[in-house]
Amino acid sequence: MPVLSTAHRLPLSVERDCSREDDSLTNLQWLQDFSILSTDLSSIANSRPPLPRASQGPCSPPAGDTASCQAPRTGKQRSVAVPTAWASLPTPSPSPVQEVDYRTNANIKPPYSYATLICMAMEASQQRKLTLSAIYSWITQNFCYYRHADPSWQNSIRHNLSLNKCFMKVPRGKDEPGKGGFWQMDPRYADMFVNGVLKRRRMPASHLDPPRCNKAIAHHPYLPVSRPSSHHMQHISGGHRQSRRYEKPNPVLPALRAPERQGDALFTPEDPLQGSNFDDLDLQTALISMCWEGDLAASNLNSTLTGTSGMDMNLQDPPMQDNHWYLSTEGQQTWEQVKEEPVVEQWYNETGFVEDVLYECPPWERVETLL
């Protein structure tokens, strides 16, 4: 086998021509032989890059396009060559939309849901109600796909008839022969089937989003929280004694709570601009607390007098007006007798009062109350 030696080497010009054809932008082998002093600038200025052939892509560089043999291309020359290459490429023609005959084509599944197929069968029938077998036969006659498909689609038809609210079952009459019941469209949802499409009705906005006022009332921080009613609880100690536990207003933040309107269950928050002065708020809190203590003492005295009389009296809910409690006319005594008798039970010792106050107080005031 012959071996190439230094005497059989190719000429230098031939090697350069071969290397130019094999070089690319990523090959830096030309940099070893390149020199600015030995380069003929006049030949580079007069040379023109060859136009790309039709077989080449618009973005592929021509063969031998390296930095050693010619200057970089300008954008104007490249922009002229690109349209010529794109013009030679064939453009795909838009395929026309072909209509599918579902009566004869068994390979394409109809683009209809099972509920839509049931509605189409009921609309095409002259009768008001159809049996399950009649729905099956209409679908197989009009759609060849279900004629040759697995019969599991019949289970889907039965499930849609049973679970979909658009269909209702009609029992068979005694004079009608045959077995099984009938199926028909519910008149309330008959408008949902329009032009072969079963539309879905949206829920009204009132069911999805309640009024904002109800949300604001429910989440208001100073409104009283609903608790189990304690009006019918009885406390028996010694003899027959009945006491009523009334809902007590909050003595700590009376100015921030919402006033209750008579004859209405809604509460409206007070104006935040009013009562913003802390001195007025403290004075108002002290005055209301004093009045509140006097009302509680009078109510406890009334319950004590009622228990000592030995009669079981059913106390009615007194009308509330301007946060004043009215004593019962029966067993009422003068103020001199009231002052002489000592008050046994204090308002702050009543069961559940401390829990009510701490529950309705804001977090920054609970620490001061506990201390």
UniProtKB/Swiss-Prot annotation:
Coiled coil: none annotated. This is Forkhead box protein J1.2. Belongs to the FOXJ1 family. It comes from Xenopus tropicalis. GO terms for cellular component: nucleus. Keywords: Activator, Cilium biogenesis/degradation, DNA-binding, Nucleus, Transcription, Transcription regulation. Key transcription factor required for motile ciliogenesis. Activates genes essential for motile cilia formation and function. The gene is foxj1.2. It is found in: Nucleus. Residues 45-74, 80-99, 228-248 are annotated as: Disordered.
